[in-house]
């Protein structure tokens, strides 16, 4: 089948925004309902729906990072790709598990660095402490600053313990595991780039 589209050139002075979303297995913890990843996806979807004039893209990361969706004003496509993210992406071996915050930021920076938008922003949604990757989160924040990119950080989860699904020979069992958010690093990342 073929379709034709009538394209219109419109000039919108929007913002270019990359969402950098942690998809590590720790995002399956259920201290937020139904779990951290789904809670983060709900917040991000509301954000996307509230920004109709902005280019928005999506980077996902665990032990490594990749672009799920480049910058686009087609938020329907973006939301479909966003909703397709499943919490077991690292468990299934699609990407290395862990939390490589610096790599997630670096991937998002690479999508924004050449942007001509009046404002360039990364929104980082993560639950944990950096424990993987070749680039530290603070180094990535310095690079973002050099390109005029502001980083806003959102810590997803609580400190303490949380129910976490563990695959066993008998099926999925829930175990309470210690969880924490490295709020100091998230604050430093945002502060370095004049974000929040």
Question: What kind of region is each of these model predictions?
Answer:
Residues 3-118, 135:
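Membrane-embedded segments
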Residues 18, 59, 123, 152-154:
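Hydrophobic/aromatic beta-strand patches that form the interior of the parallel beta-sheet core
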Residues 23, 127-128:
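Residues immediately flanking
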Residues 61, 100-102, 126, 153, ...:
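Short glycine/serine/threonine-biased micro-segments
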Residues 16, 189-196:
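Juxtamembrane amphipathic/hinge helix adjacent to a transmembrane helix
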Residues 92-96, 110, 119-121, 128-188, ...:
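VWA/integrin I-like adhesion module and closely mimicked acidic/polar interface patches used
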Residues 56, 149, 195:
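Short, conserved active-site loop motifs that form the nucleotide-linked donor/cofactor pocket
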């Amino acid at each position: 089948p073929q379709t034709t589209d009538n394209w219109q050139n419109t000039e919108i002075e929007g913002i270019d925004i990359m969402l950098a979303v942690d998809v590590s297995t720790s995002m399956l913890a259920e201290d937020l309902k139904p779990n951290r990843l789904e809670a983060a996806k709900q917040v991000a979807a509301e954000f996307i729906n509230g920004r109709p004039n902005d280019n928005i893209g999506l980077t996902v990361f665990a032990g490594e990072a990749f672009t799920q969706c480049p910058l686009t004003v087609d938020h329907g496509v973006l939301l479909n790709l966003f909703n397709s993210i499943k919490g077991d992406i690292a468990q299934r071996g699609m990407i290395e598990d862990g939390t490589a915050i610096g790599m997630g930021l670096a991937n998002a920076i690479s999508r924004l660095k050449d942007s001509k938008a009046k404002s360039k922003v990364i929104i980082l949604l993560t639950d944990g402490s950096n424990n993987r990757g070749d680039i530290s989160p603070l180094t990535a924040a310095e690079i973002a600053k050099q390109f005029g990119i502001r980083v806003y950080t959102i810590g997803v989860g609580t400190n303490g313990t949380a129910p976490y699904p563990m695959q066993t020979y008998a099926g999925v069992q829930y175990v309470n595991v210690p969880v924490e958010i490295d709020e100091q690093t998230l604050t430093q990342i945002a502060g370095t780039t004049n974000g929040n």
